[in-house]
Amino acid sequence: MGLAGGARVVLFVVAAAAAAALTAAADQIFTSSGAPFGRNSREPRYHVEFHPVDAPFNPENGQESVPMTSHVGKHYTCFLPVEETKTMKSIIPQNATNVIIESERRVKPKDPDELLEILKDQCFYRHEGWWSYEFCYYGKIRQVHVEGEKVIQEYVLGEYDADATDAYYENQTSDSADEDDNLIDTSKRYHVHLYTNGTVCDLTDMPRETEVRFVCSEPTVVISSIKEISSCKYVLTVQSPMLCKNPLFQQEKRTLSIHCNELLAEAEATVDDDSLPKEAQIIIPDPDGLHNYAAYAT
């Protein structure tokens, strides 16, 4: 969607997003008519991040950009969440406090393994005190202790087991998820891969094994936790933004980021607010006034 033809659409998305994101500063976000935007409890949560000139956000290909102005006159180029720009069809301002969003026609979502395929041949790391962990998608999980550049201790916590993973889903019951305080009532919100045949455990004389849980979470892929739930049996949780594209794994209110790059003074001179519809000229709070506040809609 081009800015000329879709400025009203995109800027009203940002307005709704900003009103939802900056809860404490919502009264500082206005249309050019001076009326504030209301918040819709059904909308996703938004987090607005401001980036200085010397450390700009690098947008993805096709990510929609929107010119914005702070209340002290600073100019920014703000980038909408990619998912939002792909799913919003039209936004019609009914009045100064309401926005109606018409969704694109429904498209059958990809299954989890299709979405996670992008992780193939990639490895991710986590450090926890004495131990460091390496998780390789469709590969191995290692637990190591390193001193300098030398590995002092190493255990393999499992290798990807396609057969065991298939059997897990064939035999899955409501009791299949471990009673984990962080995952209660979310048994349908993570996708499991099983890693088996790791280093033999001294306590059980059985190979170590790990259940890898992929959860919907933005903005990047990261190992969020690893726990030993019983002797030499582990649960490793991986935050996976690509999984959020499947509605089954979406939280009730997802958190999406709007990134705003500050413009150089010479670039600011090229921003012509008069070229935009008056109702689309939006004033946002200056980041200095937010004190790095990252607010979310309640």
UniProtKB/Swiss-Prot annotation:
Gene Ontology biological-process entries: endoplasmic reticulum unfolded protein response; response to salt stress; retrograde protein transport, ER to cytosol
GO MF assignments: carbohydrate binding
Keyword Calcium on entry: no
Glycosylation sites: 95, 171, 197
Main location: endoplasmic reticulum
Keywords: Disulfide bond, Endoplasmic reticulum, Glycoprotein, Lectin, Signal
Cysteine disulfide links: 123-136, 201-232, 216-244
Compartments, record wording: Endoplasmic reticulum
Signal sequence range: 1-25
Cellular component, GO, one term: endoplasmic reticulum lumen
PROSITE patterns given in the database record: MRH
InterPro entries named among the record's database cross-references: Man6P_isomerase_rcpt-bd_dom_sf, MRH_dom, OS-9-like, OS9-like_dom
Recorded family membership: Belongs to the OS-9 family.
Subunit comment: Interacts with HRD3.
Protein task: Lectin which functions in endoplasmic reticulum (ER) quality control and ER-associated degradation (ERAD). May bind terminally misfolded non-glycosylated proteins as well as improperly folded glycoproteins, retain them in the ER, and possibly transfer them to the ubiquitination machinery and promote their degradation.
Protein name, per record: Protein OS-9 homolog
Annotated source species: Oryza sativa subsp. japonica (Rice)
